[in-house]
């Protein structure tokens, strides 16, 4: 279950598994964004209501285009995200019609990030697409900062764990509405 190489867990993710992996600030739980059963499993593990929505994290913007509707965004709005990516900034963007509500929750938008974390970059490049990302913790608990904390909260419940260093960020990503520019977190 414990892997040093994120690419070693690609098949696990593509087969519907939920994995934990280091991000810029905390350990994340992730799965295939195109697999509703995997997304539901992740939500159940975390005890998170589907209405809240989830984040997609990618290695580059092109990986996000199948999930968002960038046609309604201005050049300046897109550029505001590109100016901060890759990095610890999550942008709320309009979702593509037909996107699973398990990803977007009750919203007409989707939270997306292009990560600068080497492990996340490697994982998404190996997958060839983004991965669902939410902090590795039960709802109401503190996010896991080490593999040991992930195991303590999710032992026997996740399908893989990438061991590695967290990034240098002291807190989870800043969330910005790309249309209004408003900082939400």
From Swiss-Prot:
Entry keyword annotation includes Mitochondrion: no
Biological processes, Gene Ontology terms: regulation of translational fidelity; tRNA threonylcarbamoyladenosine modification
Any one Gene Ontology cellular component term annotated for this protein: cytoplasm
TM regions (residue ranges): none
Keyword Transmembrane listed: no
Subcellular location per the Swiss-Prot or TrEMBL entry: Cytoplasm
Keywords on record: ATP-binding, Cytoplasm, Nucleotide-binding, Nucleotidyltransferase, Transferase, tRNA processing
Gene Ontology MF term list: ATP binding; double-stranded RNA binding; L-threonylcarbamoyladenylate synthase; tRNA binding
Annotated EC: 2.7.7.87
PROSITE patterns documented for this protein: YRDC (PS51163)
Coiled-coil blocks: none
Record field: catalytic activity: L-threonine + hydrogencarbonate + ATP = L-threonylcarbamoyladenylate + diphosphate + H2O
Domain YrdC-like: 3-185
One Pfam short name: Sua5_yciO_yrdC
Highest taxon listed in the record's lineage: Bacteria
NCBIfam families: L-threonylcarbamoyladenylate synthase
Family stated for the protein in its record: Belongs to the SUA5 family. TsaC subfamily.
Function: Required for the formation of a threonylcarbamoyl group on adenosine at position 37 (t(6)A37) in tRNAs that read codons beginning with adenine. Catalyzes the conversion of L-threonine, HCO(3)(-)/CO(2) and ATP to give threonylcarbamoyl-AMP (TC-AMP) as the acyladenylate intermediate, with the release of diphosphate.
Full protein name: Threonylcarbamoyl-AMP synthase
